[in-house]
């Protein structure tokens, strides 16, 4: 029984995370970003969102949380390193990578509020 309960919790958390990623993507679209990838997976890790605005590439970690501050705290050093490695791999596959500046952001998706965008969070 415990395994089924954990499995249901995991599925529920995964659905909540996917919904948060789509809300964050919509919010960024409204802010003028173009979404290049959602849940970009590499052997080094996953990037929740990759967005572009002019000559800027934003690598975005999305967190569904009750408060924005806890979302920023939830992205620890190990997660940051994994995201950076995945971003480096993504960039290495682009011929035009040299013309972009790169930034790492966090978007906190909060209940009954607009998402909070933490620019250059790490």
Swiss-Prot record:
SUPFAM superfamilies: Restriction endonuclease-like (SSF52980). It comes from the Bacteria. GO terms for molecular function: nucleic acid binding. HAMAP family: UPF0102. Belongs to the UPF0102 family. NCBIfam families: PRK12497.1-5, YraN family protein. This is UPF0102 protein Atu0303. The lineage of its organism: Bacteria, Pseudomonadati, Pseudomonadota, Alphaproteobacteria, Hyphomicrobiales.
